[in-house]
């Protein structure tokens, strides 16, 4: 990926999307940066002095298929093409599935699953005309293995992964690549909101959360360069997740162990926060 390309990103007001927008602009690319939270996105763009000649900041609710079509059409009319779509916007709230309000179920499914589907549809229609393109969809380790207290989130991320793998088969004959990225828990504002919640303990079972920088490095250096069908971050956690998915009964003994480890990490995080 030596020459400048046109990127369309969602979820750019914070977290992975924000970091990737910063990196891509620093590398000389053109970026169509979107988020449902336009004020936060605009503030970041101004603070980071995003180059106006290579970036456009737009509001986009990924749950709205018509909004997607309008956004892609506007981007193409100005940029001429969309070389890479990154579906990054996501939503997470840990809770027992039987206690989760309907509106929380809707947010998980609509943002995480339908948002990716609508975005991939809109971009694919344009990329088929172009004869090339790369679609990168962010799933999760929760899309590889079912996780207690994240049943609805897991369902949405399983949907992202399954859809992406199937879409890749349909789009490859048109010269379009699809990559699904499955990261472990990442240190983002969305994850930070779960730190105090007992239901979210398993999110913090890894000794250290992934950073947005680590995820960004993997996407820029590996995904954009090699266009793999699937990427696990980190690979050893991904392989463990696949093993548990292959033998689902393993989740019964392993789940409580990971949750216990996560609670311990949450406690240390709270102590560190108080100390600072």
Predicted regions and their residues:
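Conserved glycine-rich Rossmann-like NAD(P)H-binding loop of the short-chain dehydrogenase/reductase
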Residues: 27-43
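Active-site helix of classical SDR
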Residues: 120, 156
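Residue(s) in the substrate-gating loop at a strand-loop-helix junction
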Residues: 140
């Amino acid at each position: 990926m030596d020459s400048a390309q046109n990127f369309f990103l969602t979820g750019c007001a914070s977290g992975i999307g924000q970091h990737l927008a910063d990196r891509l602009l620093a590398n000389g690319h053109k970026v169509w940066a979107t988020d449902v939270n336009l004020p936060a996105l605009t503030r970041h763009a101004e603070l980071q002095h995003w180059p106006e000649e290579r970036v456009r900041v737009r509001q986009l609710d990924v749950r709205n298929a018509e909004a997607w079509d309008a956004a892609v059409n506007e981007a193409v009319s100005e940029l001429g093409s969309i070389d890479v779509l990154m579906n990054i916007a996501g939503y997470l709230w840990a809770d027992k599935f039987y206690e989760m309000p309907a509106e929380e179920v809707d947010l998980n499914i609509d943002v995480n699953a339908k948002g990716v589907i609508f975005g991939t549809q809109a971009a694919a229609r344009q990329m088929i005309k172009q004869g090339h393109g790369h679609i990168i969809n962010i799933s999760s380790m929760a899309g590889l293995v079912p996780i207690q207290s994240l049943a609805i989130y897991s369902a949405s991320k399983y949907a992202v992964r399954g859809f992406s793998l199937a879409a890749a088969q349909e789009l490859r004959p048109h010269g379009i690549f699809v990559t699904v990225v499955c990261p472990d828990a990442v240190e983002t504002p969305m994850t930070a909101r779960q730190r105090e919640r007992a239901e979210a303990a398993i999110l913090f079972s890894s000794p250290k959360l992934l950073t947005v920088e680590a995820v960004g490095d993997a996407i820029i250096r590996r995904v954009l360069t090699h266009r793999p069908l699937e990427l696990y971050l980190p690979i050893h956690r991904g392989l463990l997740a696949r093993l548990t998915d292959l033998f689902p009964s393993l989740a019964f003994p392993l789940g409580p162990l990971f949750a216990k480890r996560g609670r311990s990490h949450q406690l240390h995080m709270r102590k560190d926060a108080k100390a600072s």
